[in-house]
Curated annotation (Swiss-Prot):
Homodimer. It comes from Campylobacter concisus (strain 13826). GO terms for cellular component: cytosol. Coiled coil: none annotated. This is Proline--tRNA ligase. Belongs to the class-II aminoacyl-tRNA synthetase family. ProS type 1 subfamily.
Amino acid sequence: MKFSKFYAPTTKEAPKDASLPSHQFLIRGGFVEQIGSGLYNYLPLGKIMHDKISRVVKEEMNEAGALEVSFSVVTSGELWKQSGRYNVFGKELLRFKDRKDNDFVISPTNEEAAVALVRGKVTSYKQLPLNLYQINTKFRDEARPRFGLLRGREFTMKDGYSFHSSKEDLKREFDLMEATYSKIFTRLGLNFRAVEADSGAIGGSGSKEFMVLASNGEDDILCCEACRYAANVEAARRKPRVSEAEAPEADAAKFLTPNAKTIKDVAEFFKVSEFYCIKAVMKKAIYEDKEEVVVFFVRGDDELQETKAQNACKALELVDASEADVAKAGLVAGFCGPVGLKDVKFFIDNELRGANNMICGANEKDYHFVGVSVSGFNEERFKDLVKVKEGDKCPVCGGNLKLSKGIEVGHIFQLGDKYSAAMNATYLDENGKVKPFLMGCYGIGISRLIAVMIEASHDEKGCIWKKECAPFDVEIIISNLKDEAGVKFAFELYESLKKAGVSVIIDDRNERFGVKMNDFELIGFPYALLVGKEFANGKVEFITRDGLSKETIEANDAFRKIKESL
């Protein structure tokens, strides 16, 4: 490609709202152009990157036996009503009506469309398993689109959906997709971890996120320093804690505790560790058809993890309960406990199951119970509710958990029959019985990956592309177009590299040398071959973008040097 014929409008200034390097360099480097809030046009450089990433994803998905399809970007609202997600998904789902007043959505994901595609067509266990995927445009009406391609409203995603006749086969495919995703991100040169995750609006169980470790990451992840365990903080587990502090001595006795409303007050009043106090966190759970106060009980020195709490009560949203909400529910703020609590939905953290010698509110103003045993409750009350923190112990090996920042680039789920059962998508098993499909779904953010690669590899001058995914492998820079011999050499090398299968761009623009070098550093091709003043002495300069190291070599050795570097 000749730069003189290429379209990459570079700029010196970054957009005012571009806080992240990826956002700044994608705009300044002429990869994309913002046309609205969370909306971007792809220029030639951006489209090349998009297609290179897509090709890697396709190759590995095809190798794993998945089949490529293409769903309509617009999906019938009726399908989303059948699955139950039409109202649950919230305002991020862009809904509209056509001229005949039919409901439609612009798909942020395609579980419903995938189920509809096989429903009534795949009818026997003999046709299973089946794994279908696409790379297509999605739309999510984000309230605050930001960070460029990392959180836009319109984006490109690889989404796949598998169908199975047994849990064992679903788990096999889930593990295969985990291995396939690992191959994809390894080929793209990314430092990533597969982490346990919350399933969110997609639903199901057994999900994993693929996180690229980056200081600018928007997600908090906990990684074990001794083994491969890693998890998003929303789903992180830990080895149950123990305390060497002395436990309170009493046998479920009731004590007057005037004005001791906080955990700190109670611990100081009884002169015990907060570890032995039970904290009540009151929330208002919002459902599709009602609202109610829900109480979550955790140890006094723990914090409630909001996503875990929301999953426990299966609410659409959790908000803090107001004083009026608490009073209406018949609760006594500051003195609420699980013992004798009636007519209110409540959950207890798993680590409190069977705990002895605990202190909790007596559900009466100014009174607490001391010496409580957390037993005799229905098992459905116990849930994983606590926020795991750095320094807690790994649930797998007991090593220390370390907090890191990450950017999500992929997510895989074991959905079970959530969608197939709701949408009446069934098959006949080997015994002739009608059963709903078991499903998995698997997503990769294609457009997001472009930004993530920059976040993971850049300096103050611009992008530093890995050769596995660079828009061009090497750039030949002609510093002086009046040097006929140098120009002739540069174009002969350019043609030789093209014939050898090297992706090469030659900067033959009638621009100052400084402009050409600045653009090379900003755009970030892995290597550059500079044909400059030293060419008169048979020398050229080989530049490595990562570190901007320069090496003067014989001009006749340039082809070999480039090929070896690639």
